[in-house]
Amino acid sequence: MMVPVRCFTCGTVVGEHWGEFKERAREGDEDPAEVLDELGVERACCRRMLVSHKDLVDIVSPYQ
C-alpha cells in the first residue's frame, strides 16, 4: 500500500528515504545494504521496513 512513514518497531522516520532507496536499490544498480548504509539507516527494524515493502495499490485498487 503506501510507503510506511515510521518504523513499526522503534518509530524512527523511514519514509523520507524511500524515494532514493527505490531509485538506487530496486532497479538493481546497487546493493540494497550499501544504499541503506549510505542513507544512514542503521537499525535492523528500520532496514526491514524499506527492504520488505511491496506496493500493492495496483493490485488492491480494483476491489474498492
UniProtKB/Swiss-Prot annotation:
GO terms for cellular component: cytoplasm; DNA-directed RNA polymerase complex. GO terms for molecular function: DNA binding; DNA-directed RNA polymerase activity; zinc ion binding. Keywords: Cytoplasm, DNA-directed RNA polymerase, Metal-binding, Nucleotidyltransferase, Transcription, Transferase, Zinc. Coiled coil: none annotated. It is found in: Cytoplasm. It holds the Pfam family RNA_pol_N. It catalyses: RNA(n) + a ribonucleoside 5'-triphosphate = RNA(n+1) + diphosphate. It comes from the Archaea. Its EC number is 2.7.7.6. PROSITE patterns: RNA_POL_N_8KD (PS01112). Its cofactor is Zn(2+). Zn(2+) binds at C7, C10, C45, C46. It is an enzyme of class 2 (transferase). Binds 1 zinc ion. One of its GO terms (biological process) is DNA-templated transcription. DNA-dependent RNA polymerase (RNAP) catalyzes the transcription of DNA into RNA using the four ribonucleoside triphosphates as substrates. HAMAP family: RNApol_arch_Rpo10. Belongs to the archaeal Rpo10/eukaryotic RPB10 RNA polymerase subunit family. Part of the RNA polymerase complex. This is DNA-directed RNA polymerase subunit Rpo10.
